[in-house]
Amino acid sequence: MLHLFSYSDLNHSLLVFLALFFVLFYEAINGFHDTANAVSTLIYTRAMSAHVAVIMSGIFNFLGVLLGGLTVAYTIVHLLPNDLLLNATSKNALAMVFSMLLAAIIWNLSTWYFCLPASSSHSLIGAIIGIGLTNAFVTDSSLVDAFNIPKMTSVFLSLVFSPIIGLIIAGSLIFLLRYYLNNNKIFYRIHMTPLERKEKDGKKIPPFLIRMALILSSIGVSYAHGANDGQKGIGLIMLVLIGIVPSSFLVNLNTNKYEINCTKHTLNHLEKYFLEKNIKKSNIIKNKEEINNLVVRSQSYNSIKNIKNTKLLLKNISNYNDLSIKKRFQLRHYLLCISDSIDKKVNSSDICSKDKRFLIHSKKVILKTIEYAPMWIILIVALSLSIGTMIGWKRIVVTIGEKIGKKRMTYAQAMSAQITASFSIGIASYTGIPVSTTHILSSSVAGTMLIDGDGIQTKTIKNIALAWILTLPVSMLLSSFLYWIALFLI
């Protein structure tokens, strides 16, 4: 890690430090901005004291980042066009990162100040879109080519529909709990609010089994939040390092000889597969640019030629440190192009399930070279998120706990909302889809209130919906404007 600051140019080292600080600051804001999602239901059902709940949430956020993998991280990275990543100068990369993060931070702090549970994910993805748009206009390139359209579409749909799904599932759970446990002699208390429990039984805390269910479901939300949102921080740092220090981070220089040989064998199998299927024409990678020795672009190479070029680069290579910086650029480029070809074939209508499984597995193997994160990055992101979790949480907790429904949550409502959020976010993290923890949980709470007939506070719901609608376009325009100014200043 320390080698990042060892440049002879003091200004460069300082800018690298500031870029990393911005990412970690964003992640800390994400922590306290989204902690309410995990602890609000615990606090307002009195299942756990506020400080203990927040500390517990911080611990499981940390574990979520540490153990959650990297699928979401690289979904974020690949939202930006490969040409922008591969050809950005050090100054352009810094301008890109600072503009993106500053836009997301400004919006997140603004919504936090006004107690609105807006989405950190929406703001970050909006900022990334803004960078891509500005880059397309400045370089006079196609807007269609500026984005990974399939990836952008899936991310956009997940952000739009995940709150709706959360509302429906949580509402269904509360309906089932009402149907089966409303008159149950043992579990009828699950439909009490904390105040009703105190008036009837003279106790503040929930019954033991209900309390354990609330705590466990809250742990699930915290862990899932770390696994999903923490990965976004990892992806951001890798964006910073690939753009600013490409020689060290374009490929995983710690890849061992066995893993390199696995990549070579996989390339051999892929070459054989594509030759047998004779699908050269259907795997053209679209781009109008010519090959340039200094600038690596997504040329019109077909999959077989990309594989042959990659094999040529890796011939007699047992350590990626033996590759020159230029060849590391080329290796990353070819592997991304092969991955694009695999995606096109996997999504085609003329592929059998056996071939699809083979291609998906092969893609995972070859991308290990470029889709990675050093352990120190995972640790500092986990630490930033967990520290952020332990501060600044109270403002949004009040909104989630008191201002969505017209009365306080029952134990059943809290549990239904948390179970829905933990499973939804957990599945999204596993499949590599970035989702909004904030909107999934707040919509789940609203769903339980609607089904239970308690009613919701229209003003708060309108404010949350307004923040939901505005976050993406505002952060997009803000980052686009900041990046445009930065490009002219440098």
Swiss-Prot record:
Residue stretches in coiled coil: none
One GO term (biological process): phosphate ion transmembrane transport
Lineage top rank: taxon: Bacteria
Catalytic activity line of the entry: phosphate(in) + H(+)(in) = phosphate(out) + H(+)(out)
GO cellular component: plasma membrane
TM regions (residue ranges): 12-32, 52-72, 94-114, 124-144, 155-175, 205-225, 233-253, 373-393, 421-441, 470-490
One GO MF term attached to the UniProt entry: symporter activity
Tagged with keyword Cytoplasm: no
Keyword terms: Cell membrane, Membrane, Phosphate transport, Symport, Transmembrane, Transmembrane helix, Transport
A Pfam family reported for this protein in Swiss-Prot or TrEMBL: PHO4
Membrane topology classification: Multi-pass membrane protein
InterPro entries, per database record: Phos_transporter
Cellular localisation: Cell membrane
Keyword check for Signal: no
Signal sequence residues: none
Function text: Low-affinity inorganic phosphate transporter.
Similarity field: Belongs to the inorganic phosphate transporter (PiT) (TC 2.A.20) family. Pit subfamily.
Protein name: Low-affinity inorganic phosphate transporter
Source organism: Buchnera aphidicola subsp. Acyrthosiphon pisum (strain APS)
Gene giving rise to this polypeptide: pit
